[in-house]
Amino acid sequence: MKKRIVAAAVLIPLLLLLTLVAPEWIAAVVMSILLSIGTYEMLYKTGLVRRSRLILYAMVMAFAVAMWSYFDAMDAYLMLLLLVYTALLFSEMMMDHVKVRIEMLALCYVSGFVVPFLMGSLIRILGMTNGRHVILIPFVVAFMSDSGAYFAGLKFGKHKLAPVVSPNKTIEGALGGLAAAMVGMLIYALVLDLGFPRMQVNYGFALLYGLCGALAGMFGDLCFSIIKRQTGIKDYGNLIPGHGGVLDRFDSLMMVAPLMEALLLLAPMVM
């Protein structure tokens, strides 16, 4: 617990500095590097893919996909990236079809393209018109949901939510996470409303963000938990003391970030 608190005390200021102060290109590069590390964790740390070239291709692809989000590039560039990536992966399979299985390529697609594209929503949100004002929304939702679920589960948890996938999660904890995320978004909306009087803030949409985001975060958490369960590992890495690896700390954001991006475009909380 002490390591977790110390790590959080360091990470939170760094997060605020990165998202609110640092130039957008620096934030994009740092996020892209973290996604590349997360790709390595999913492939190598799980033991599912140990072929060095496949891991290298996936890590480079993860970085490139994330940076594509920053440059707001044409879809044609993403298509070319995917084309080259696909060719490289299947070339590896053709050179050694006995050891390189289709399951390995499928995981390379998920870790090298799908996850970075979804998590790249953070970079795309930062690039929006009110990006500096709304970039913290995915983090607020994920943090409040995780914290609310933890403390509510600790205090009131009796009924298991997903005993096979994640035995420690409870229905009571999930409800606490939903409530905490909604309260957190109301507070965040109030801060924006008071801090930026010219900005129009929709409190109803803030509640919607909290509710939907918390549900998405819990699902994202379970997605990465089932991979750890199947591969028999406790953590994806040890990059962050007390928290594990990149995927251990930011697992819920895989679902929260793209959902928040979609909601910000379809039902803007701030104008």
Residue ranges, per PLM feature:
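C-terminal-most transmembrane helix of multi-pass membrane proteins
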Residues: 256-257
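Transmembrane alpha-helix interface/packing and boundary motifs in multi-pass membrane proteins
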Residues: 212-217
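Juxtamembrane boundary at the C-terminal end of a transmembrane helix
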Residues: 262-271
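Interfacial loop-to-transmembrane junctions
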Residues: 229-252
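Membrane-embedded alpha-helical bundles of polytopic integral membrane proteins
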Residues: 1-211
